[in-house]
């Protein structure tokens, strides 16, 4: 079975993604393989929450241009890709890579790598203040909810819809991703000023650049409190995200999401 050595996502025009891949050297015939391309808004494991973009491509092509996202490249809306690699001789299939690839997920230089390594050590130090958090990526594309979606207004009419969790899309949130982060419930005034409007119940969350977060994503802490992402500020090097500083708003305990996500 072929094994990916790289899956790169690039964009040159802001209207499409250029997807290119390469395989680890092998004696197998590459003509015995076909490739399917899958896409999702969340880098969840497995393939069930990914949609197929293209199927039956020759593995020997090594690249594909996804133009179907020409209207879906909104700011703060990352897309994650996997390949389904079919062995035409044995009918076997594997899905790679794990985790999924996305735009600008590579390491630009050694300095970037070292900064991320040190921050990762601090977050995972048992003597530090790093904690486990679960991220529920909000769906912003797919099949509209048949219960609450108003096609004229182009929005949901029920924020408490039990079918779509008030998102307007079926299966409104993806499965959870576990990450390490540091929560600050009493930020300094200089930190608050980065975000503007601030409520007493809001908190800051410091996480690394993966997975990239966007407003309205849901975060669960180790006390089973749910928070919604209000704003995200990033620390970058050479255009690549090192760290995300997230303003979170605490959700009331009677919110429907507590029953649906926890």
PLM regions: where:
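Short beta-strand-centered aromatic/proline hotspots
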Residues: 218, 225-236
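Active-site-proximal polar cores
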Residues: 104-152
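Pro/Thr/Ser/Gly-rich low-complexity, intrinsically disordered linker/stalk tracts
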Residues: 1-31, 90-109
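Short beta-strand/loop turn elements enriched in aromatics
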Residues: 167-202
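Short, solvent-exposed secondary-structure boundary/capping segments
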Residues: 234-252
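Glycine- and charge-enriched low-complexity intrinsically disordered segments
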Residues: 125-131, 248-262
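Recognizes extended acidic, P/S/T-rich segments that occur
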Residues: 32-77, 88-93
């Amino acid at each position: 079975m072929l094994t990916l050595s790289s899956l790169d996502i690039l964009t040159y025009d802001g209207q499409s993604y250029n997807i290119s891949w390469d395989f680890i050297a092998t004696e197998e015939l590459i003509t015995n393989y076909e490739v399917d391309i899958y896409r999702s808004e969340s880098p969840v494991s497995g393939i069930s929450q990914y949609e197929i973009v293209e199927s039956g491509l020759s593995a020997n092509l090594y690249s594909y241009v996804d133009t179907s996202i020409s209207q879906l490249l909104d700011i703060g809306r990352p897309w994650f890709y996997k390949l389904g690699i079919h062995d035409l001789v044995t009918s076997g299939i594997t899905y790679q890579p794990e985790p999924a690839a996305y735009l600008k997920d590579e390491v630009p230089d050694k300095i970037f790598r070292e900064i991320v390594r040190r921050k990762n050590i601090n977050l995972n130090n048992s003597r530090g203040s790093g904690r486990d958090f679960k991220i529920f990526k909000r769906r912003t594309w797919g099949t509209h909810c048949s219960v609450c979606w108003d096609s004229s207004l182009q929005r949901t009419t029920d924020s408490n819809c039990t079918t779509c969790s008030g998102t307007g899309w079926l299966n409104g949130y993806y499965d959870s991703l576990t990450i390490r982060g540091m929560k600050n419930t009493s930020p300094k005034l200089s930190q608050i000023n980065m975000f503007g409007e601030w409520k007493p119940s809001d908190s800051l969350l410091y996480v690394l650049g993966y997975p990239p977060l966007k407003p309205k994503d849901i975060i669960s802490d180790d006390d089973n409190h749910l928070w919604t992402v209000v704003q995200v500020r990033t620390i970058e090097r050479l255009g690549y995200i090192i760290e995300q500083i997230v303003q979170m708003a605490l959700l009331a305990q009677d919110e429907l999401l507590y029953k649906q996500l926890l």
